[in-house]
Amino acid sequence: MLQPKRMKFRKMHKGRNRGLAAGTEVSFGTFGLKAVGRGRLTARQIESARRAMTRHVKRQGKIWIRVFPDKPITAKPLEVRMGKGKGNVEYWVCQIQPGKVLYEMDGVSEELAREAFGLAAAKLPIKTTFVIKTVM
């Protein structure tokens, strides 16, 4: 699963998921899966969607993952009293703003790409849409 190799600090504040997305254009492939809603994706969800797409296209073409989970989420163990410091890192997430391209695909037909992205979208907790690269 995806997670950073090193970080300057192990734990992070919760913060707020506001603002506009960077990476809103399809830049590597021909087709893309773009976020419509706002939320956060865990490393497990990113990997699960990638596997669904890869299996559907039967390993033909190429898939790019445009998001990376770089924010640690902590949790305290069950039945532990409040206080005594922040909990341990449980999993990693990527914060998503509307318009962010999550995945890109190339080397497959549009119909196959739509089906594969549909399977991937079912694994994700945010609303997404299918986009095609615009040639200037």
UniProtKB/Swiss-Prot annotation:
PROSITE patterns named in the record: RIBOSOMAL_L16_1, RIBOSOMAL_L16_2
CDD domains: Ribosomal_L16_L10e (cd01433)
Keyword terms of this UniProt record: Ribonucleoprotein, Ribosomal protein, RNA-binding, rRNA-binding, tRNA-binding
Tree of life domain: Bacteria
Molecular function (Gene Ontology), one example: tRNA binding
GO cellular component assignments: cytosolic large ribosomal subunit
Example GO BP: translation
Annotated function: Binds 23S rRNA and is also seen to make contacts with the A and possibly P site tRNAs.
Assembly and binders: Part of the 50S ribosomal subunit.
Similarity annotation: Belongs to the universal ribosomal protein uL16 family.
HAMAP family tied to this protein: Ribosomal_uL16 (MF_01342)
Full protein name: Large ribosomal subunit protein uL16
Organism, as annotated: Shewanella amazonensis (strain ATCC BAA-1098 / SB2B)
Lineage: Bacteria, Pseudomonadati, Pseudomonadota, Gammaproteobacteria, Alteromonadales
